[in-house]
Regions:
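Acidic, histidine-bearing metal-coordination/catalytic regions of metal-dependent phosphoesterases
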Residues: 1-73, 78, 184, 188
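Short, flexible coil/linker elements and helix-boundary hinge sites characteristic
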Residues: 6, 21, 45, 148-149, ...
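N-terminal short leaders/motifs
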Residues: 8, 136-150, 238-252
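Core catalytic region of metal-dependent phosphoesterases/phosphodiesterases
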Residues: 52-183
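Short, flexible hinge/linker loops that cap or flank conserved catalytic cores
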Residues: 64-65, 194, 258
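Short, flexible loop/turn elements at secondary-structure junctions
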Residues: 75-81, 193, 204-207, 268
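Conserved beta-sheet core of the metallophosphoesterase superfamily
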Residues: 106, 197-201, 206-272
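An acidic, phosphate/nucleotide-engaging active-site surface
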Residues: 162-214
Length: 272
């Protein structure tokens, strides 16, 4: 009887979530966030083992003696969706491509990637098929890739739909075709700019919160996975937000207390 009660409760919860627009695939994706700690376990062979390092001092990118660079993340574009603002996306890409010392990191959901398991009308609300969405993404990003403007790319919950169904990540295809770093579920990057070094952690995001505080809480949770980063980047929630805080540490050589500022950036969306 107890097992039947639990089963009925689970069915009721799934029904409510479906009515709220949360698909079963989205629920599975949220579990991926819960598994981030397991993914980073030392015994996990698939855990990230090395950060992607970029020098902006004339070694890899940019010209020597640069004091700063600009990073404009791209994500939640949903190419293929009937309400995707493709022209605005093209304008962003043009700016990144033509502006000196400006780069991007692709944080997922670049395509709509609707399947028969998607919530609502799903595939009936897209303008063209998944293979066309992938090809269009490749062609739109190609000019940036040729100029080494894309520092990494990862999947989002929309790409996760085909990953779960057929073990195919559209963003891995894009990365391989364009020769850009594939970050997987979580991205670690090191930027050397002038005499400074910045550590960055990226994740598409998995929050369904409708409040600013809830969304900030979701990106702050990334500190439990990636410690002592300078910048945390996240998308998914379709609302732009920014926050910062200060963390203190001890210099092991001098014993002095070191203050370090951490930045939290949540990007928006290009759905009309």
């Amino acid at each position: 009887m107890a097992d039947q009660t639990v089963l009925n409760l689970e069915d009721a919860v799934k029904k409510v979530l479906t009515e709220m627009g949360v698909s079963q695939t989205d629920l599975l994706y949220k579990k991926e966030l819960d598994k981030l700690q397991d993914i980073h376990d030392l015994e996990n062979e698939k855990r990230p083992k090395k950060a992607h390092r970029f020098s902006f001092n004339g070694v890899d990118l940019a010209e020597p003696n640069k004091e700063y660079i600009s990073i404009i993340p791209i994500h939640d574009i949903h190419l293929g969706a009937i309400n995707a603002n493709k022209e605005k996306f093209k304008a962003y890409l043009k700016y990144i491509c033509e502006t000196e010392d400006t780069y991007t990191i692709a944080l997922g959901d670049l395509i709509e990637n609707a399947t028969k398991c998607s919530v609502g009308l799903g595939i009936f609300e897209t303008e063209y098929h998944i293979d066309e969405q992938i090809e269009e993404t490749i062609e739109l990003l190609r000019p940036l890739a040729e100029k080494k403007k894309i520092l990494g790319i990862m999947p989002g919950n929309h790409e996760y739909r085909t990953m779960k169904l057929v073990s195919m990540d559209p963003m891995k295809i894009v990365a391989d075709r364009l020769g850009i770093p594939y970050l997987g579920w979580s991205g670690y990057l090191i930027f050397e700019v002038g005499d400074q070094m910045y550590k960055v952690f990226c994740f598409h995001g998995a929050s369904s919160s409708s409040t600013p505080a809830g969304r900030l809480n979701s990106i702050r949770k990334l500190r439990d996975v990636a410690h002592n980063m300078d910048l945390y980047l996240m998308g998914h929630v379709h609302r732009r937000q920014y926050d910062k805080d200060m963390v203190y540490d001890i210099d092991e050589k001098t014993g002095e207390i070191i203050a370090k500022k951490r930045h939290y950036v949540i990007g928006g969306s290009l759905l009309s």
